[in-house]
């Protein structure tokens, strides 16, 4: 269960005294008084900041509205008499300090001066205090706010050690109130009885020594009757903060996260939905539900706004639905609109020959045959003309009565006959239309049954086809899954083969390069070997030739010398012949 904590703000006039010990805050241990006041007046300071004095006064007056400051009586009752005595002395000293100081100074002057006479020894001014010392009277307005955030009633949640009894009947005296709270006298720290301009009731603030004591009092006394005779009950709320502010500080301006509780116009009590049910009317005025139940009128108690809508005519034309200028047939009860709207009443006369129709607004009867009003006209017995009939009581003649009865009988007979013919024809038409409609419905019913049968056959075929398609789809899904796995395997294998192919290509290129280098080396070696072989063959051939020469020639070759000229290239013919043999000789010589 959750409740809303309340904030009590006492807005004082400019020259009103400040009540002693009125301030209270449940969060006093968490925040200092300056921080609490700064937080409270934050929105008011923001609203009044940068405004001229005239604009500030206008804003304050606008929020104050028609509320007037009145005398607020605060009576304090403490459990300890010594504390009450100390408070009274503080009040006496604060209120009478200027007078007491002046009387003290004057008495000193009188003592220091020479006493000429006994009367000069007495002081001119003597300070005194009149009235009940525990009662304070201030001038202002009492504001009651509730927090927009709900607070739980669990034991581990911080609420407040101060409770407020919103409405105490004026017939209940202070002695009766003390009897009501007698079981909790030991845990009550102080009580403040607040009386403002609200008649026949007052408010009580009760401060306990601890929150647990306040919770116990709340659970015990909330919703409990003050006595067994009266119906008034104790309405308790937790007080989060009680503060005193001056009007020029913006005390009447709205407070952030708080909603001011209005007064019920009927009972003049504060309206709190957590305590009593609140009913808001169509004109946006709120009252206690019980108070509005006692209000016998259907209008709003404040503005006299009618809460229930006016009754609307339910009659309307049977053909077009118009609700104006309606006529009802006196024979069959058909309602139709007049000739100045859509003429449905006259069309009904043309169809049924029902002569008489009555206007619903003024109950005047119209005769369509005679084309005039007949609500006070009868036919004369002598000439049959229509004359106005006025009943004169006992002076009415029997002949006129007989004529009227006879004419009424004729009229009733003719109308009943025409009505019988009309309704018989209508019944025949209705039967004919009903028979045709029944035949049409039977035909449609047969067609619908055939369509349903065809649809059932189609549905069965489609279900079978669906089953076969589902089987095929299942098989295809299996194949697709298998092919997907094979595809993944082939892709992995292809990936591996590509990697191996790249490695083999690199190896092949390396082998080709090595082979090419080897071939080049072999070719070079072969070329060198061929040259060596050619030299060897040339040497052997030369040696053989030299061996076949005579000894003298061999001797000459051995002793011979080979001279290579510088210009051997320019004369190849001369050097070729002479150089060949020496070369051979040299070789043969080297061989030997």
Curated annotation (Swiss-Prot):
It comes from the Eukaryota. It is found in: Cytoplasm. Residues 582-592 have a biased composition (Basic residues). Zn(2+) 1 binds at residues 317, 320, 337, 344. A zinc finger (UBP-type) spans 301-393. It catalyses: S-ubiquitinyl-[E2 ubiquitin-conjugating enzyme]-L-cysteine + [acceptor protein]-L-lysine = [E2 ubiquitin-conjugating enzyme]-L-cysteine + N(6)-ubiquitinyl-[acceptor protein]-L-lysine. A zinc finger (RING-type) spans 264-304. Keywords: Coiled coil, Cytoplasm, Metal-binding, Phosphoprotein, Transferase, Ubl conjugation pathway, Zinc, Zinc-finger. The modification Phosphoserine is found at residues 52, 97, 117, 119. Zn(2+) 2 binds at residues 329, 332, 348, 354. Residues 80-94 have a biased composition (Basic and acidic residues). GO terms for biological process: MAPK cascade; negative regulation of signal transduction; protein ubiquitination; Ras protein signal transduction. Its main location: cytoplasm. PANTHER family: BRCA1-ASSOCIATED PROTEIN (PTHR24007:SF7). This is BRCA1-associated protein. The gene is BRAP.
């Amino acid at each position: 269960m959750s409740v809303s904590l309340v904030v009590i703000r006492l807005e004082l006039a400019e020259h009103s005294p400040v009540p002693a010990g009125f301030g209270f805050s449940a969060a006093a241990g968490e925040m200092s008084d300056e921080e609490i006041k700064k937080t409270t007046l934050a929105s008011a300071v923001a609203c009044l900041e940068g405004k001229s004095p005239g604009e500030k006064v206008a804003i304050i007056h606008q929020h104050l509205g028609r509320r007037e400051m009145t005398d607020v009586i605060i009576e304090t009752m403490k459990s300890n008499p010594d504390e009450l005595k100390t408070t009274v002395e503080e009040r006496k000293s604060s209120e009478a300090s200027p007078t007491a100081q002046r009387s003290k100074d004057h008495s000193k002057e009188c003592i220091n001066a020479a006493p000429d006479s006994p009367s000069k020894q007495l002081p001119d001014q003597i300070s005194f205090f009149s009235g009940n010392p525990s009662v304070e009277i201030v001038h202002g307005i009492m504001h009651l706010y509730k927090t927009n955030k709900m607070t739980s009633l669990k034991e581990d949640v911080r609420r407040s050690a101060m409770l407020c009894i919103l409405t105490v009947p004026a017939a209940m005296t202070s002695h009766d109130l003390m009897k009501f709270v007698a079981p909790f006298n030991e845990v009550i720290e102080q009580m403040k009885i607040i009386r403002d301009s609200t008649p026949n009731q007052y408010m009580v603030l009760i401060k306990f020594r601890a929150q647990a004591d306040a919770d116990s009092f709340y659970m015990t006394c909330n919703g409990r009757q003050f006595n067994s005779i009266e119906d008034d009950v104790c309405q308790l709320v937790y007080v989060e903060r009680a503060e005193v502010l001056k009007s020029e500080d913006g005390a009447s301006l709205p407070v952030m996260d708080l909603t001011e509780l209005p007064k019920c116009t009927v009972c003049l009590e504060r309206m709190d939905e957590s305590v009593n049910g609140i009913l808001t009317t169509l004109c946006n005025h709120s009252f206690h539900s019980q108070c509005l139940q006692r209000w016998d009128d259907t209008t709003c108690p404040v503005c006299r706004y009618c809460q229930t809508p006016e009754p609307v005519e339910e009659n309307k034309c049977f053909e077009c639905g118009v609700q104006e200028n309606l006529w009802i047939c006196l024979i069959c009860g058909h309602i139709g609109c007049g000739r100045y709207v859509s003429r449905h009443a006259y069309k009904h006369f043309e169809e049924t020959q029902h002569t008489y129709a009555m206007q619903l607004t003024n109950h005047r009867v119209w005769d369509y045959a005679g084309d005039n009003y007949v609500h006070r006209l009868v036919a004369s017995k002598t000439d049959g003309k229509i004359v106005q009939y006025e009943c004169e009581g006992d002076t009415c003649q029997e002949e006129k009565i007989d004529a009227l009865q006879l004419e009424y009988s004729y009229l009733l007979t003719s109308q009943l006959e025409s009505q019988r013919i009309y309704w018989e024809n209508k019944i025949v038409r209705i039967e004919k239309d009903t028979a045709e409609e029944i035949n049409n419905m039977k035909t449609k019913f047969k067609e619908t049954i055939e369509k349903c049968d065809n649809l059932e056959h189609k549905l069965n075929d489609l279900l079978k086809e669906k089953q076969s398609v589902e089987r095929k789809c299942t098989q295809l899904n299996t194949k697709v899954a298998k092919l997907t796995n094979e595809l993944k395997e082939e892709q992995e294998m292809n990936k591996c083969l590509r990697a191996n192919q790249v490695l083999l290509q690199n190896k092949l290129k390396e082998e080709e390069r090595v082979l090419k280098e080897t071939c080049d080396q072999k070719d070079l070696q072969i070329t060198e070997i061929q040259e060596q072989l050619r030299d060897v063959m040339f040497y052997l051939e030369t040696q053989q030739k030299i061996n076949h020469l005579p000894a003298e020639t061999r001797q000459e070759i051995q002793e011979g010398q080979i001279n290579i000229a510088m210009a051997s290239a320019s004369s190849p013919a001369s050097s070729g012949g002479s150089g060949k043999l020496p070369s051979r000789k040299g070789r043969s010589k080297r061989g030997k």
